[in-house]
Amino acid sequence: MYPTRRLLQSTRLTLFTRINCSLCDTAKYTVKNLREKRPFLYSEIDVMVPQNKTWKDIYEFDVPVLHVQRVMFKSSDGRETLSDPKKLFHRFTEQEVENTIKEVEE
């Protein structure tokens, strides 16, 4: 039996967020609900943390921002090569996230 293409592909979602952001809390809840229905890799980046200055310069006034990317390659040391991100900004529904994931997986 061979794994299906879908099982071989991983999708990574990265949520750019900050504390005291109600839109960010809603976005986290949306992603959490979707994660219960389908597998994907997920991480959060707080743009206000000093080591994330690059992301702060880009997204400080735009959070929440969700990057949806396909993992193209994963090396033996765990580094990932990712597709260009599809981005969702501010307010997005579970259905919009799922549609974006499907688009990235194609």
Residue positions per predicted region:
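Structural micro-motif
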Residues: 60-69
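Non-catalytic, surface beta->alpha helical segment in thiol-disulfide oxidoreductase systems
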Residues: 68-106
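Local sequence-structure signature of Cys/Sec-based thiol-disulfide redox active-site neighborhoods
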Residues: 3-38
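Thiol-based oxidoreductase modules, predominantly thioredoxin-like and allied folds used
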Residues: 39-53
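Short glycine-biased active-site loop of nucleotidyltransferases that positions the nucleotide triphosphate
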Residues: 55-58
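Pocket-edge positions in alpha/beta enzyme catalytic cores
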Residues: 16, 51, 86-89
